[in-house]
């Protein structure tokens, strides 16, 4: 329900703000103790509140952006020529749930598909709730395209949310699920 999602957002923002406030207050207190500077005591409270608020707003803005692409080249000695330039796109920690919805997943899928990868590896923590609640939100994952397929393994959040059901749902979407196993790509 939308009210629950809004409460989760509000709770997350509040928790983030209080966490920033706590750390900054401790740093402020240490600085005041070391410098024994009473003249900054009142003004520094306002600066701490402003800084915690700024950090929270920046965190909120960053959380709403589509995940970034980071290119990592992994040199492998004696790599067969046929595998030179083989690309794997890794997707991890999407956490679809109250704050991450299907549109965000669609943007990730579009970005990944534009990379024209040889394989896609989804390495867990895709979801933060059960299949019956989130299957519509994760459906765009079925549109992932890679020459050798898209593979998924579970993370701890899938276990919190019914790992067996999620593995079945991922298979239904056309993803190749791996559980204590490997595959050989030809």
Regions found by a protein language model. Name each.
Residues 2, 59-61, 66, 75, ...:
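Short, functionally important structural connectors and interaction interfaces within domains
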Residues 78-186:
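Soluble catalytic domains of enzymes that build or remodel membrane lipids, polysaccharides, and related
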Residues 5-12, 36, 74, 89, ...:
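Short amphipathic alpha-helical coupling elements at transmembrane boundaries
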Residues 1-65:
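Non-catalytic terminal accessory segments
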Residues 6, 17, 28, 40-41, ...:
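Arginine residue identity/basic-tract feature
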